[in-house]
Amino acid sequence: MLKILVPTIMLFLVTWSSPKKWLWPITTTHSLLIALLSLLWFKWNMDMGWDFSNHYLAIDPLSAPLLILTCWLLPLMILASQNHISTEPIIRQRIYITLLISLQTFLIMAFSATELIMFYIMFEATLIPTLIIITRWGNQTERLNAGTYFLFYTLIGSLPLLVALLLMQNDLGSLSMIIIQYPQPLSLSTWADKFWWTACLIAFLVKMPLYGVHLWLPKAHVEAPIAGSMILAAVLLKLGGYGMMRIIVMLNPLTKEMAYPFLILAIWGVIMTSSICLRQTDLKSLIAYSSVSHMGLVAGAIMIQTPWSFAGAITLMIAHGLVSSALFCLANTNYERTHSRTLLLARGIQVMLPLMATWWFIANLANLALPPTPNLMGELLIISSLFNWSSWTILLTGLGVLITASYSLYMFLMTQRGPASQHLLSLNPSYTREHLLLNLHLIPMLLLILKPELIWGWTF
């Protein structure tokens, strides 16, 4: 653990001591080395259980894939931001990179925390750098509105969790995840216990987000700069899923009767948000709503608590993290050239940028869960486990899969095919940096096809 945390903290010093000319190459290289070093965490499988660095930090098969995804994303965010941030004054560039590094540090400590209260503190700490990135480097004046939505939705959802954790500490005498999972099931029967159950999960359902409390996400995605969108889609939403998987195993037997309304919202949300995608004119908003749709499947899977559903949830979270981040990078390459996110104004780009169209095609096929991508493995496991839980769910999940395929192809056709506008005929060519960025997103996803058990979490 420390072999990753210490170099990450050293990256703060590197950022502030590097000469202006070498700031971006040095920070990118250093963060890429950390990402490669983090791949060693893949060796923790179920036989080995927890691997402790100390009493408060440990890795297990559930947290290892998410930790690696977090480390993998930092060099990609720095690469993606280089074009539009490198024109700013040097002090702003350093602050921007520092915020990204601090976000990675908080996320590493959140995913590896063994104490629930430490997890809660790190969960909340990620708010601060994300909020600054959105409100300071966002594209339009609506970024302040988006920042307010993001802050208040997350805070209002998180406060009941703090009260619930304090009550848990009072009852059980400990908040260690390792200790809490072994006592006898809690005898939860009163109305107060039902409120406590809801308080434990609502923060994570807002973060995922569940349909109904998802309104902050499209706003935050649309207004955030590219690095903000990438980290939000790839890792911050997964904090909600990870937190749910950690805490829901402690809340039985109440989950069996309390989960129904949330399950219905999650599965209905898959159809609703997928349908909203078909009506979008803003490219980033379309990708943001597709994230809500995918995370609805994850929320439903975690609620039913079977080995298959847990494996499907973690697999889909990792696969979606890589694919949605790649889609935001592709949307950003379009935006940097056309200065518009409107689908109608950027048609027929395949003629000018044929290789970029190939990346669009691969990313969209992965998004619609083409065999044999990890997205398909995750969705199949989730849909199968939901079908075993209730055969009626196949109608909703099946329809959701069809609409997902429809909006993915719609997004590809609207951006790449059709007659090219006159104002697009003088576009800048694609750069090696952009192709490297997309390679580093999509090649790991394709390699996971060869050994998917690396991201199956507890069940392997």
Swiss-Prot record:
It is a multi-pass membrane protein. The chain crosses the membrane at residues 22-42, 59-79, 93-113, 114-134, 148-168, 195-215, 225-245, 258-278, 286-306, 310-330, 351-371, 394-414, 440-460. Its EC number is 7.1.1.2. The keyword Protein biosynthesis does not apply. It catalyses: a ubiquinone + NADH + 5 H(+)(in) = a ubiquinol + NAD(+) + 4 H(+)(out). GO terms for biological process: ATP synthesis coupled electron transport; electron transport coupled proton transport. It is an enzyme of class 7 (translocase). Signal peptide: none annotated. Its main location: mitochondrion. Keywords: Electron transport, Membrane, Mitochondrion, NAD, Respiratory chain, Translocase, Transmembrane, Transmembrane helix, Transport, Ubiquinone. It is found in: Mitochondrion membrane. InterPro entries: NADH4_N (IPR000260), NADH_Q_OxRdtase_chainM/4 (IPR010227), NADH_UbQ_OxRdtase (IPR003918), ND/Mrp_TM (IPR001750). It comes from the Eukaryota. GO terms for cellular component: mitochondrial membrane. Pfam families: Oxidored_q5_N, Proton_antipo_M. The keyword Transferase does not apply. GO terms for molecular function: NADH dehydrogenase (ubiquinone) activity; ubiquinone binding. Belongs to the complex I subunit 4 family. Core subunit of the mitochondrial membrane respiratory chain NADH dehydrogenase (Complex I) that is believed to belong to the minimal assembly required for catalysis. Complex I functions in the transfer of electrons from NADH to the respiratory chain. The immediate electron acceptor for the enzyme is believed to be ubiquinone. PANTHER family: NADH-UBIQUINONE OXIDOREDUCTASE CHAIN 4 (PTHR43507:SF20). This is NADH-ubiquinone oxidoreductase chain 4. The gene is MT-ND4.
